[in-house]
Curated annotation (Swiss-Prot):
Origin: domain of life: Archaea
Protein name per Swiss-Prot or TrEMBL: Orotidine 5'-phosphate decarboxylase
Pathway per the UniProt entry: Pyrimidine metabolism; UMP biosynthesis via de novo pathway; UMP from orotate: step 2/2
Keyword Lyase tagged: yes
Gene Ontology biological-process annotations: 'de novo' pyrimidine nucleobase biosynthetic process; 'de novo' UMP biosynthetic process
Database matches in SMART domains: OMPdecase (SM00934)
Family indicated by similarity: Belongs to the OMP decarboxylase family. Type 2 subfamily.
Species of the source: Natronomonas pharaonis (strain ATCC 35678 / DSM 2160 / CIP 103997 / JCM 8858 / NBRC 14720 / NCIMB 2260 / Gabara) (Halobacterium pharaonis)
Catalytic activity: orotidine 5'-phosphate + H(+) = UMP + CO2
Gene Ontology MF terms: orotidine-5'-phosphate decarboxylase activity
Amino acid sequence: MSFFETLADRIDDRDSVVSVGLDPDPDRLPEFLDADLPRWAFNRRVIDATHEHAACYKPNAAFYEDSDGWRALEETIAYAHGKGVPVLLDAKRGDIGNTARQYATLLDDDGLGADAITANPYMGRDTLEPYLSRADKGVFILCRTSNSGGADFQNLTVGNDKRLYEYVAQRCQEWNEHENVGLVVGATAPEELESVRDLVDLPFLVPGVGAQGGDAAAAVDHGLADGVGLVNSSRGIIFAGEGAADEDEYFRAVGAAAKRLKQRLNKHR
C-alpha cells in the first residue's frame, strides 16, 4: 500500500486531516518531565493525548539532530506507528544524488522507518529521485512556504507571467509517476494556495494554521485532493498546556487543542 493510500485510510478512519507537528523545543518542554530522553517522554504523552484526532505526525528533524535526539526520534516514530498513525519526517532535504540516496535511507525500515519526507526542489530532479522512486513512500516537495520570507524567491516571475512556485508545482505534477508526490503550500497566503490548486491535483501539506495564524478554510478548500491532504499545527497543539497546574492538565489541553483543530477543519470539508 502506498503512503497516500495509507493516509487516505487514516483520514477516513479518524475523520481528520490534522497533522500534529512534533517539534519538542527543549526551551519549552514542561519542567515536570524527568526522563533520560525528555523529548521522547514529551512526544509519547503528546501522542497519547492526540492520536485519536491525528491523521499524521510530523516530527521536524531539526529538533532531534543530536545523539539523544536521534534516539528520541526513533522511539517517537515507532510509538506513532504502534498507534496506527503514519509519520511524515519534516527534513526538507535537498542535495546531489549520492547524498540524497543517503538521506532517503531515513525512509527504510532499518533507518528511521518514516512513511514520508519533505524535500527541497531547488537543486532539481536528480536530487529528488531517491524519494520519487520510492512508490511505497511519500515525498512532499516545498512549493510555496508559509514563512514571511518565502516570497523572496518563490514569488519571482520567471517567464510567461508565472511565478517560480507555480513552475515548481507544475513540474512536481510531471514527476508524480508513482503517485507519491505532494506539495508543501502554506496557509498564510490563501490566494497563492488557491492558485497552486488550480494548477495541480496533488495532495498538499498545509502548514501555518496554528501559531502562524493561517486561513483554515482555505487550507481545507484548496489543500485536499480527492479528500487527501494534511493541515499541520505544531506549537498550537503540543504547547497548548503551557501554564497548566500539573502534567495531566497539560496533556488534556494538548488533546483538546488537537480535537478543536480537527473540528474547525471539518467544518470546511
